[in-house]
Each structure stands twice: as structure tokens, then as C-alpha cells.
Amino acid sequence: MSSIEERVKKIVVEQLGVKEEEVSGEASFVDDLGADSLDTVELVMALEEEFECEIPDEEAEKITTVQQAVDYINKHLGS
């Protein structure tokens, strides 16, 4: 089992079609990785599926960077 961070980065690469080396913890989905609003919705859906959790819309809006996604999953996984 790979780490949560590795799994999140893999999803970001697949969903946004960016290079793995572009995906850093502080990378903003919109500003740095070129995601639009539809991309971010699909990204959240992919994270929900991968980690078998539900991310409420009001929480999803706060997740704007790779690290925020990792932190959210770490905090809510298994809680």
C-alpha cells in the first residue's frame, strides 16, 4: 500500500494530465496545475472513490492544494 500522499499525487496526475514532477505539496490545482472548476469536481470525486470517503462540498471548496488534499484525507480517513 502506497502512502496517502503518493496516492493523492497519482490521482492528480491522472485527473489533470500533468507531469508527476509538477505535483508538489504546495501546488495549487487551479493556479499551478491548470485545473478548472470541472477538473476540481472530478478530482474530488476521484479522491472520494480512491479513499472510500465522502468529502462535503463546503470542505471540497477549501481543498485547493495537493497538501490540503493529503491533510484532509489523513484527518478524515478512519474517523
Swiss-Prot record:
Record-level Gene Ontology MF annotations: acyl binding; acyl carrier activity
Q: Which residues are recorded as modified (O-(pantetheine 4'-phosphoryl)serine)? A: S37
- Where is it localised? Cytoplasm
Instruction: List the residue ranges forming a coiled coil, or say none.
Output: none
One BP annotation, GO = lipid A biosynthetic process
Q: How is it modified after translation?
A: 4'-phosphopantetheine is transferred from CoA to a specific serine of apo-ACP by AcpS. This modification is essential for activity because fatty acids are bound in thioester linkage to the sulfhydryl of the prosthetic group.
Family the UniProt entry places it in: Belongs to the acyl carrier protein (ACP) family.
User: In which pathway does this enzyme or protein participate?
Assistant: Lipid metabolism; fatty acid biosynthesis
The record describes the protein's role as:
Carrier of the growing fatty acid chain in fatty acid biosynthesis.
The chain positions of domain Carrier read: 2-77
* A GO CC term assigned to this protein in UniProt: cytosol
Q: Which NCBIfam families match?
A: acyl_carrier, PRK00982.1-2, PRK00982.1-3, PRK00982.1-4, PRK00982.1-5
**Keywords in alphabetical order:** Cytoplasm, Fatty acid biosynthesis, Fatty acid metabolism, Lipid biosynthesis, Lipid metabolism, Phosphopantetheine, Phosphoprotein
Q: What is the protein's given name?
A: Acyl carrier protein
The record's gene field reads acpP
Q: Which Gene3D superfamilies match?
A: ACP-like
